[in-house]
């Protein structure tokens, strides 16, 4: 401490030196108080409530028979919005119901039945999709292949999780899925894709 006094003595004769000393001490205290934030890539597992399986031949307009990947046969009621019934939330079916197609279903249980909230025809989702800036193929097994070599952040993987489509880390609601079009929505907007044949 004595050596600091010797060095700062000429500066302390004027008021400027005192100000400099106070600022130096304050800066040292500020550095001590800072804590470093650790960057971790910790993955949090999310419980997936989706039931996966194959659409059964017992499927009709108002019921979905699904043979689950575990081998169980479940029957979900499909609620529709029509003038005669007062359904608050109709079942959202995307991609159609075709016996033998792979399906992903989220739903809930009432007192006497299973009710489908969202049904995604995974077989219809597979294929080559294009838009103005995207050109990709959703393949079985969770792989996405991009046909645009210069794309900055191409999607490379996909999965259905709790009724939503995950492309890499981007989560989308499927607003529409048909034989020739796919509408995906997230916080950034609605994205339209056409099927490439």
State each model region's role:
Residues 29-197:
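Lipid interaction determinants
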Residues 3-16:
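Bacterial N-terminal signal peptides that target proteins for export
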Residues 24-27:
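C-terminal motif of bacterial Sec signal peptides marking the signal peptidase cleavage site
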Residues 18-22:
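Alpha-helical transmembrane segments
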